[in-house]
Amino acid sequence: TTLILESLVPALVASFAGKALPAHVHQIDPGDIERVHLIDSTPIGANIRSTVATYSGVLDILRRSFAALPAAKERGLKAGAFSYNTGSLRCPTCDGTGQISLDVQFLPDVDIPCPDCGGSRYGKEAYQIRLPLQVLPDELNELDGESEQDEADELAKSIDAPETAHDDELSLPEILALTVDQLLALSGNLPSMAVKLRTLSELGLGYLTLGEATPALSGGEAQRLKLAGEMHKKQQGALFVFDEPTIGLHPHDVEVLLRVLQRLIDKGATVIVIEHDLDMIANSDYVIDLGPGGGEAGGKM
């Protein structure tokens, strides 16, 4: 931690910005590294309005899709109306937070699910506008998650899918109650959303509910969600630093994480992992061992 998080990363950041290095770092040679991404386990904000759907960009696609429906146009509803933060369809009781605070005398306030919307964040009118969804065709199901969004859209146009051939119709609050994998299976007519959901699923986050608040995620879940936006980019010159990403993970989830890290490397990235997990160490190209002991008791390489 001292070597990487308190020395290497701040020194690289200072070097890229043309600023003075940290006092204890005498020299650094970035080599081919051009940028640093620190993927730690800190919560994704403290705002309960941030959810898996908003952070991943899925909600933006859904809002535009709902606004394009005839039922929405008849009511004069645009994409902004489907936002639970500011839209006209949000629950008026909780203002779209999905919960209310009870003032308990002599004790801290207690947050409970909103009695009117049941935690869905939306009012009754939102349930009246329903989006047709189709089962994901094999052609889209085989997308590797690396196709660009416009390629997925072009592929969808070539698939014979009549407007009447819908497998389900759901309102926005009902969709946000689904898991990533459940919505992925029904995203055949929304290929751009399917690509985003496929990425989350490949990151081992398919069990997360779309409407789940991001501050409630575990450290490992937060790390992988932060990675979602990086998985489609070329990573030449990028350094990713992970601080003990396997903490709390099941061995199967460690395997998923290893595949994710390998994908970053295949795209040209360099990955540094601060870790004690033997599977992670065994899969590394290089192992730098510091110690014995830690802090002032260690330091030998």
What is each PLM-predicted segment?
Residues T1-M301:
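Conserved phosphate-binding elements of NTP-dependent enzyme cores
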